[in-house]
Amino acid sequence: MLLLISPINHEEALESIKGGADIVDVKNPKEGSLGANFPWVIRDIREITPEDKLVSATLGDVPYKPGTVSLAAMGAHVSGADYIKVGLYGTKDYDEAVEVMENVAKTIKDVDNDTIVVASGYADAHRVGAVDPMEIPKVAKDAGCDLAMLDTAVKDGHTLFDYLSIEDLEKFVNEAHSYGLKTALAGSVKKEQLKPLNDIGCDVVGIRGAACVGGDRNTGKIHHTAVAELKELCDSF
């Protein structure tokens, strides 16, 4: 299981890299769960990240505006992102989610077939009126994406496991794998939750809070020792 760590700036990216993160995921928590950072921040982090590590960029908790989101995707690609993550926040159902994601996939695959397009739903979608999280694997498949992901939309201390059982998550992973897709799971994931995620076959685990000093994704800063501890755990399973 690969470890994805979400820094917000140059300093945190260096800490993530030093700690051994497999994927450096550039985001901006001030703008939401999958808040988008600026192109120059993505570009800077791509430049300092070793070539054998992937850089991911979030496009934001996006609205149901396929054109707007597609242009944002091109911006992330031009800035150097290897993974492009779309938070399906304003899409209320399967049809809207597919429409957004198929346009993002077309935008990216037309220029670089190797860039990984990620459809991300929310385990707590009912709290924000977003598409059902269990529909995300089918959305990703039908839209031509590479990876199906879940996170949590509301960061109030609740974790992925507060909304979906391990059986639900295993079903999510198995369905995505049956379509030939990879999976990523995130949402205030704690250290003790890594093994259950690994055991159900999750490909990537996404973390910010548990990698921060004090464990707070907003007020804390990512530190390499916390990242290294998480990486060691992931590698031990």
UniProtKB/Swiss-Prot annotation:
Explain the purpose of this protein.
Answer: Catalyzes the formation of 4-(hydroxymethyl)-2-furancarboxaldehyde phosphate (4-HFC-P) from two molecules of glyceraldehyde-3-P (GA-3-P).
Gene it is expressed from: mfnB
Show the GO MF annotations. carbon-carbon lyase activity
Query: What are the catalytic residues?
Result: 27 (schiff-base intermediate with substrate), 85 (proton acceptor)
Q: Which domain of life is it from?
A: Archaea
Please indicate if the UniProt record lists Lyase as a keyword: yes
Under what name is this protein listed?
(5-formylfuran-3-yl)methyl phosphate synthase
- Spell out the Pfam families in the cross-references: 4HFCP_synth
Listed under catalytic activity are:
2 D-glyceraldehyde 3-phosphate = 4-(hydroxymethyl)-2-furancarboxaldehyde phosphate + phosphate + 2 H2O
HAMAP family xref list: MfnB
Q: What class of enzyme is it?
A: lyase
Q: Which UniProt keywords apply?
A: Lyase, Schiff base
The record's listing under NCBIfam families reads:
PRK02227.1-1, PRK02227.1-3
Instruction: Identify the species of origin.
Output: Methanobrevibacter smithii (strain ATCC 35061 / DSM 861 / OCM 144 / PS)
EC identifiers of the protein? 4.2.3.153
**Which InterPro entries does the protein's record reference?**
4HFCP_synth, 4HFCP_synth_arc, RibuloseP-bd_barrel
